């Protein structure tokens, strides 16, 4: 049983970049994750993001990552106990993809905030100063992230990252559902923008730049600032 629990926790830690965040444990001792609740209604981000997109994105897309990730955890739990190393290696792809999808979307929901509650208000305080220092201005950061997101081939994410060792902020991109930690162990996500088509196609069709330009109106910079200050505290 101890080996099973350890294997599951190690797999979860891999996807989360070294910090396991269990939500529940089954009777077998397998650590699983759960779909997080949103702090706002599906339609609260309109007209920037439609309620239909938010409902499908959360209830279907993210929920599927959770189901498939938990399934992969159960499977790797079994093959580790059996000592089947080749099966463990084969499951890493499913764990990375679905675990990354869960991690990335859990951050994404926190990065969004209704306009009526302060969404879109530019960053202030220490994060605002860091952005000015590392990018020249807030407007320059937005332009850079929009350009990186528009240029990203296929599906993926564009991130505002904090390098906790260098104490610098940077723009990073990751393919598919790769979490930011795959670009460097010292990188902490402050903001992530989902540029998979499921995040915008029903509303913006194939015009990804329009989606990128508009999403800043519902960005939760208060959350990003809190993460920044907590990491560097």
Swiss-Prot record:
Against Pfam families, the record matches this protein to: Sod_Fe_C (PF02777), Sod_Fe_N (PF00081)
What residues does the transit peptide encompass?
1-29
Its needed co-factors are: Mn(2+)
Residues given in the record as Mn(2+) binding sites: 57, 105, 194, 198
Cofactor binding note from Swiss-Prot or TrEMBL: Binds 1 Mn(2+) ion per subunit.
Reactions catalysed, semicolon-separated, are: 2 superoxide + 2 H(+) = H2O2 + O2
Q: Which GO terms describe its biological process?
A: response to abscisic acid; response to osmotic stress
Tissue expression remark: Predominantly expressed in the embryo late in embryogenesis.
Q: What is its EC number?
A: 1.15.1.1
Where is it located? Mitochondrion matrix
Q: Which GO terms describe its molecular function?
A: manganese ion binding; superoxide dismutase activity
Give a GO cellular-component term.
Answer: mitochondrial matrix
The alphabetized UniProt keywords are: Manganese, Metal-binding, Mitochondrion, Oxidoreductase, Transit peptide
**What role is this protein assigned?**
Destroys superoxide anion radicals which are normally produced within the cells and which are toxic to biological systems.
Q: Which family does it belong to?
A: Belongs to the iron/manganese superoxide dismutase family.
Cross-referenced PANTHER family, in alphabetical order?
A: SUPEROXIDE DISMUTASE 2, SUPEROXIDE DISMUTASE [MN], MITOCHONDRIAL
Q: How does it assemble?
A: Homotetramer.
Give the protein's recorded name: Superoxide dismutase [Mn] 3.3, mitochondrial
């Amino acid at each position: 049983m101890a080996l099973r629990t350890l294997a599951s926790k190690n797999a979860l830690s891999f996807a989360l970049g070294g910090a396991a965040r269990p939500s529940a444990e089954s009777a077998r001792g397998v650590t699983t994750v759960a779909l997080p609740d949103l702090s706002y209604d599906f339609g609260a981000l309109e007209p920037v993001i439609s309620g239909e997109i938010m409902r499908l994105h959360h209830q279907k897309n993210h929920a599927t990552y959770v189901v498939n990730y938990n399934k992969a955890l159960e499977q790797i739990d079994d093959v580790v106990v059996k000592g089947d190393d080749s099966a463990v290696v084969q499951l890493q792809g499913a764990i990375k993809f679905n675990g990354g999808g869960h991690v990335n979307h859990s951050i994404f929901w926190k990065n969004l905030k209704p306009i009526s509650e302060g969404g879109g208000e530019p960053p202030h305080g220490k994060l605002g100063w860091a952005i000015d220092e590392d990018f020249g201005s807030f407007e320059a950061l937005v332009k850079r992230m929009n350009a990186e997101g528009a240029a990203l081939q296929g599906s993926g994410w564009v991130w505002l990252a904090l390098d906790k060792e260098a104490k610098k902020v940077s723009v990073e991109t990751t393919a598919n559902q790769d979490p930011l930690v795959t670009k460097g162990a010292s990188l902490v996500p402050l903001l992530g923008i989902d540029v998979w088509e499921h995040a915008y196609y029903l509303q913006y069709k194939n015009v990804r730049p329009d989606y990128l330009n508009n999403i800043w109106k519902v960005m939760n910079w208060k959350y990003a600032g809190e993460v920044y200050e907590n990491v560097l505290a």
